[in-house]
């Protein structure tokens, strides 16, 4: 009986590569020459700091673009609403969503059940296990999860026949 897990995780290596590429782009951008701006990555949190709020938003855009180039879904970013002002720098913290929260998992299971596909889904910690009789049903669930609009990127692993 085919089964798979629906998870939400960020590839640590690709995230680090995207941050490194963002730092490289920051150093080469003309509008940041002579400005005090930085991008730092530590403990799954990216800290963006610049001299004003507008530049912080530009740093978010640079990071978002580099993430999409490295095939990391920018929807997994959780950016602070307001930048923190300390001294003469503004800083933003960007966290990345890992795992599926219980509320989101319940919504996903409800969407799967409402689709009338012949599959069973169950919540297992921070993932959702889906089993069905046909591989085609699981592929339909993959499409359904991607198009669900739950503000969270999903990956599919442990695909077994």
Curated annotation (Swiss-Prot):
Organism domain of life: Bacteria
Gene Ontology molecular function terms on file: nucleotide binding
Keyword field: Nucleotide-binding
CC per GO annotation: cytosol
Claim: Nucleotide-binding is one of the keywords in the record: yes
Record-linked Gene3D superfamilies: 3.30.70.860, YajQ-like, domain 2
CDD domains from the UniProt entry: YajQ_like
Family: Belongs to the YajQ family.
Its job: Nucleotide-binding protein.
Protein name (Swiss-Prot/TrEMBL): Nucleotide-binding protein Swoo_3646
Source organism: Shewanella woodyi (strain ATCC 51908 / MS32)
């Amino acid at each position: 009986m085919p089964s798979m897990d629906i998870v939400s995780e960020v590839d640590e290596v690709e995230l680090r590569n995207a941050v490194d590429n963002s730092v490289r782009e920051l150093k080469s951008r003309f509008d940041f020459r002579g400005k005090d701006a930085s991008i730092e990555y530590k403990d799954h949190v990216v800290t963006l700091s610049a001299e004003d709020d507008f530049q912080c938003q530009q740093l978010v855009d640079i990071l978002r673009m580099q993430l999409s180039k490295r095939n990391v879904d920018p929807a997994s970013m959780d950016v602070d609403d307001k930048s923190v002002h300390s001294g003469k720098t503004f800083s933003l913290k960007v966290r990345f969503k890992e795992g599926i929260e219980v509320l989101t998992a319940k919504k996903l299971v409800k969407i799967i059940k409402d689709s009338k596909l012949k599959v069973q889904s169950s919540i297992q910690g921070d993932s959702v296990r889906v089993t069905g009789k046909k591989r085609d049903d699981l592929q339909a669930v993959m499409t359904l999860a991607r198009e669900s609009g739950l503000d969270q990127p999903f990956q599919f692993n442990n695909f077994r026949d």
